Amino acid sequence: MNDFFKYVECAVTVCDTECVIVYQNEKSVAVNGDMRGKCMLGCHNDRSRGIIARILSEGVSNSYTISKKGQRKLIHQTPWYKDAADGSGRTVAGIVELSVVIPGEMPHYDRG
């Protein structure tokens, strides 16, 4: 299988439902260190753990911006899914987090 995210210019981190990191692209490893096979909960406070639990239990997404080391970033966390074992549809399999550096000012377009 192709690793489409290996060299993209944003950090891509994926965990399973036990919050164990199952994938990091090159950018994620460079920013966060190699966390593959480790539980990510130790890196998060109680508030963040609550958000993680909600994403996993309700299948909702979470987005916000941060400033870190002089860069603004958009963080988007969204569930990923797998087919349900009983064939009834799909079930949350974990979380994908995208961390994208964004400029201080950027255009916004209304396409509606």
Question: Predicted segment positions?
Answer:
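Sensory modules in modular signal-transduction proteins
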Residues: 1-24
